[in-house]
From Swiss-Prot:
The keyword Ribosomal protein applies. NCBIfam families: L28. The keyword Ribonucleoprotein applies. One of its GO terms (molecular function) is structural constituent of ribosome. GO terms for biological process: translation. Belongs to the bacterial ribosomal protein bL28 family. One of its GO terms (cellular component) is ribonucleoprotein complex. It comes from Rippkaea orientalis (strain PCC 8801 / RF-1) (Cyanothece sp. (strain PCC 8801)). This is Large ribosomal subunit protein bL28.
Amino acid sequence: MSRKCQLTGKKANNAYAVSHSHRRTKKLQEANLQWKRVWWPEGNRWVRLRLSTKAIKTLETKGLSVMAKEAGINLNKI
């Protein structure tokens, strides 16, 4: 599985690591992803998702069903 948030689609960003002498080397800024078990009331079961920490905070306000619908995810297949 790729390092990508399953609800928001967040993934790594290409950036430069800049030294004191201003030499630049490429680096990846990875998203802060966590495995999270979320209760899905409509399905009456737990769903295990790989989410960014921003998505976890948004999930608490919006709810799982609304966010999954916005992302176009069928929770029955997960």
